């Protein structure tokens, strides 16, 4: 799970739009 969170954080950090989508979920 920690690895997934790290990957998600890395992606969200690069793509602000993705971060919003993740927050919505």
Swiss-Prot record:
Q: Out of the domains of life, which is the source?
A: Bacteria
User: Keyword set for this entry?
Assistant: Ribonucleoprotein, Ribosomal protein
Q: One cellular component GO annotation, for this chain's record?
A: ribosome
Q: Assembly state and interactors? A: Part of the 50S ribosomal subunit.
Family, according to the entry, reads as follows: Belongs to the universal ribosomal protein uL30 family.
Q: What is this protein identified as? A: Large ribosomal subunit protein uL30
For this protein's source organism, the top of the classification is: Bacteria, Pseudomonadati, Pseudomonadota, Gammaproteobacteria, Pseudomonadales
As recorded in Swiss-Prot or TrEMBL, the protein's gene is named: rpmD
